[in-house]
């Protein structure tokens, strides 16, 4: 009788597990709801106190972060494949290896806050809300792209995301301008202005520092230090590699950019600093890119394969999060494999769309050049007025 009862219960639970909703319920029962995780202390500059050295990670957050990081990783690898198949032309800068920066920054701010970055922008496009389909379609120059196929890799845009910028460092003063607008409007919003270690020596970056400090703008200057500006190591291009100290009178912090929780907590700290009216702050994210500078760079002429593999094996951001989730009973190997399979399917479907969606027609070439403002009050007062009908 007891054996028969056990068999019946086993069959009942087996049937329940076949149903996704019940399977998710049963899975959640065996996992912890949250875990307290230690994170590396940040190096501080002109700050008496920094971000916390421990934080709570919920199961829901962990699963979300893991999935988003996997999407970015697979999306970039698919972009590499499409480029080699000549579906993508021109410039293409990939961010695989830097997923913790992309996802961690978004986790530390509000959706209404603003982000502006350089040309390595695909990951931030995704975390700002764009779909994989629209990003890959933009890379292949299709109508369904986020910029209607006209921007390509370096010029993608989303709500409160002012895209990739092709000129090295040019986005930094623009970010200060966005922060000035936030202060002027008194809306409590901030701007994250991202740039790489290669752009950190640009004069316009220091000009933006100065004006932001002078006017106490709510701007977080973020240097993504991936150790190489194109093919030049940071030690060969900068007299000082303490990028978090380059703001002179602006406080700064150096963050482990391979750990999503370190990035998240540092971003929250920096955002609170700006929102409280203390002015700008500089964040240096120590990270690494697995690909070369761009698709035309194999990435092994100025660094060894062993160096890249060493970072992959010891500091990979997805691996670190996966290990943290499993060791804290926030997930299981089997559950994460299911997420991986789901992500792979999503990216494959997006790639199919990006290679079959039609290209924008020639008659769209002159569209979206001018904003259709109301007519000028004085007829004929502006010599360029007749060209506004081109769009």
From Swiss-Prot:
Domain of life: Eukaryota
Catalyzed reactions: N(6)-[(R)-lipoyl]-L-lysyl-[protein] + pyruvate + H(+) = N(6)-[(R)-S(8)-acetyldihydrolipoyl]-L-lysyl-[protein] + CO2
Keyword Transit peptide attached: yes
Major localization class: mitochondrion
Transit peptide location: 1-30
GO biological process, one term: glucose metabolic process
NCBIfam families from the UniProt entry: PDH_E1_alph_y (TIGR03182)
This protein's name: Pyruvate dehydrogenase E1 component subunit alpha, testis-specific form, mitochondrial
């Amino acid at each position: 009788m007891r054996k028969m009862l056990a068999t019946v219960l086993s069959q009942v639970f087996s049937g329940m597990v076949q149903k996704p909703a019940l399977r998710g319920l049963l899975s959640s029962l065996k996992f912890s709801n949250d875990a307290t995780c230690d994170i590396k202390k940040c190096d501080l500059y002109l700050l008496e106190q920094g971000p916390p050295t421990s934080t709570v990670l919920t199961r829901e957050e962990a699963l979300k972060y893991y999935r988003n990081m996997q999407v970015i990783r697979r999306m970039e690898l698919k972009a590499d494949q499409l480029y080699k198949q000549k579906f993508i032309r021109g410039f293409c800068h990939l961010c695989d290896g830097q997923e913790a920066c992309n996802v961690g920054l978004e986790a530390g701010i509000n959706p209404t806050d603003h982000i502006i970055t350089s040309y390595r922008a695909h990951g931030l496009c995704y975390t700002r809300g764009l779909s994989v389909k629209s990003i890959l379609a933009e890379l292949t120059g299709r109508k369904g792209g986020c910029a209607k196929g006209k921007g390509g890799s370096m010029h993608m845009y989303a709500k409160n995301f002012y895209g990739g910028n092709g000129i090295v460092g040019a986005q930094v003063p623009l970010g200060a301008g966005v922060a000035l607008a936030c202060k002027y409007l008194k809306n409590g919003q901030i701007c994250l202005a991202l740039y790489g270690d290669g752009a950190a020596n640009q004069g316009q970056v220091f000009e933006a520092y100065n004006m932001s400090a002078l006017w106490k703008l709510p701007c977080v200057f973020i240097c993504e230090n991936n150790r190489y500006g194109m093919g030049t190591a940071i030690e060969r291009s900068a007299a000082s590699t303490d990028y978090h100290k380059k703001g002179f009178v602006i406080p700064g912090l150096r963050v482990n950019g391979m750990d999503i929780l370190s990035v998240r907590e540092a971003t929250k700290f920096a955002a609170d600093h700006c929102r409280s009216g203390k002015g700008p702050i500089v964040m240096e994210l120590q990270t690494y890119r697995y690909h070369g500078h761009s698709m035309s760079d194999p990435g092994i002429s100025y660094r060894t394969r062993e160096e890249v593999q060493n970072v992959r094996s010891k500091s990979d951001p997805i691996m670190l999060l996966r290990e943290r989730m499993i060791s804290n009973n926030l997930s299981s190997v089997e559950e994460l494999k299911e997420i991986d399979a789901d992500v792979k399917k999503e990216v494959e479907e997006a790639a199919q769309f990006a290679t079959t969606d039609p290209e924008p027609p020639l008659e769209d070439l002159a569209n979206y050049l001018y904003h259709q403002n109301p007519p000028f009050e004085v007829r004929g007062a502006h010599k360029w007025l007749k060209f506004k009908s081109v769009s």
